[in-house]
Amino acid sequence: MYRKDEVSYFIVDAHVALWDARPENQRNIHGKQFIDCFYDYHRNLSPESEVWPYEEYLYQGGERLMNDLFRDGYVDHAIFQPAQLGEFYHRGFGQTEEASALAAAHPDELTYNHNFDPRNGEAGLDQLRADAERFNLQGVKLYTAEWHGNSRGWSLEDPWAYRYLEACQELGIRNIHVHKGPTIRPLDRDSFDVADVDHVATDFTELNFIVEHCGLPRLEDFCWIATQEPNVHAGLAVALPFIHTRPKYFAQIIGELLYWVGEDRIQFASDYALWTPRWLVEAFVDFQIPEELGEYPQITTEQKKKILGLNAAKMYDIPVPPELQLPAAEEPAVGPRGADKTAESADHLVGA
């Protein structure tokens, strides 16, 4: 929980990872390229006081994760979103055994999501069913630009992807987190294109599609999809750190998301250990839209509460203390918000 100016916020970090990118786990040069690209994002977008030494960044471990999130970081609950990247790392990038064991030991604080790759065919479907039972999965993290043999990406519209999504419906895995954002060396930018979300969101209305990184750099494409698909949500991982280095750019991102998508379908995420949540939570609570961007209304405290934790808590049935709750919202609206309103009526601009 975070408290400032007599206001308390329930915090759900909806995108965290426990990775191992140490040299002994790097399968080839691409493993080093990947983590080096991560580190460049980290050091270039973080306040100087929050930059880790490179060696520490390669592997953080469970003890440090628990400290950075829950003791120092204000987080009440966090959700693992692991990437496999087996072509780059011997034991994978996200550490399945360590992260899932940590979540099992701290069920009130951690939820473990897993991943799948439809290019694994029938064997992968069997593995998904086994993983769903083993981890009691509520969600999965998908990486459509991941390499697999000679393949350098896949689409949510692929026939095999549909079979996996159908299996998710059958298994009760309702939350589909898809990386649709900045490319990471050596992956291909176009394999992260957000366009395929439109198709599956229409065909799988019982599933939630959380677009991690809100489609950046294709924010406009994402907004035009999400505004007419009520089961499409925005994850703020990677977008949030621009609050420090490019506050005007972040204001445009959050302003567009609130206008097109609405306050009930945006989720806070630090993308730990890319960044730590403490400074992001503090900065977001303090943030206001700059005056020169007057076309966007100011962000209200209620909107910040929803984004920082209440939206993800609702999606994952995470208990929220009564004093930190807000009145239940109606079903998410579609279409742009507040097109005929003024900044003075900001509290009513966002559809429920």
Segments predicted by a language model, with ranges:
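Short aromatic-enriched loop/helix-cap "lid" or pocket-rim segments at secondary-structure transitions
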Residues: 22-29, 92, 125-127, 152-154, ...
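Catalytic pocket-lining loop regions of alpha/beta-barrel enzymes
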Residues: 138-139, 153-268, 293-303, 326-351
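Short active-site segment of divalent metal-dependent hydrolases/proteases
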Residues: 18-19, 182, 216, 274
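Histidine-centered divalent metal-coordination motifs
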Residues: 15-21, 179, 213
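Alpha-helical scaffolding within the catalytic cores
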Residues: 60-67, 94-100, 124-128, 194-197, ...
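Mid-to-C-terminal alpha-helical segments outside catalytic/metal-binding sites
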Residues: 1-14, 20-69, 77, 260-267, ...
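Active-site gating/metal-coordination segments in enzymes
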Residues: 76-191
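Divalent metal-coordination and catalytic microenvironments
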Residues: 15, 78, 112, 140, ...
